[in-house]
Amino acid sequence: MKKIQHPLMALLLLATALSVACSADRTETVSSPDGNIEIKFCLTPQGEPTYSATYKDRPIVANSLMGFEIKDAEPLTGGFRMDGVNSSETHETWAPVWGENDSIVNNYRQMAVNLSRGDLKMNIEFRVYDDGFGFRYLFPEQPAKQYVV
């Protein structure tokens, strides 16, 4: 194990870790079907979405802030409130039109986190497979809002 030789660097790392600290009562988790991968989602006290990931209880993604910035618009990085969480599990097989395999198994657990900030609604959907995970942002239809994709 390497010793941190720069006290300023150690202080910076500590400040970063504390800045994305979550409220323990609002932490949601979803794991892979085999239980090896676990994703934790929470909001900081400032309403910033964060997630972390572990594999066999070892960290693979430290607490990381989520959100994004849109040109000429307010950033979608904080001030959110969690309105609900929906979880589901999928185990299906489908046949590709072409390729090496006749069938592909689609086996994952999903967690959709519903967030709001004022009249803005945003969902973050996590899918966790036995061999990896992903997430995406979804914007449900909203009155008086127009999005261009």
Model-derived features: where do they sit?
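Bacterial N-terminal signal peptides
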Residues: 9-19
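Bacterial Sec-dependent signal peptides at the C-terminal "C-region" and cleavage site
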Residues: 18-29
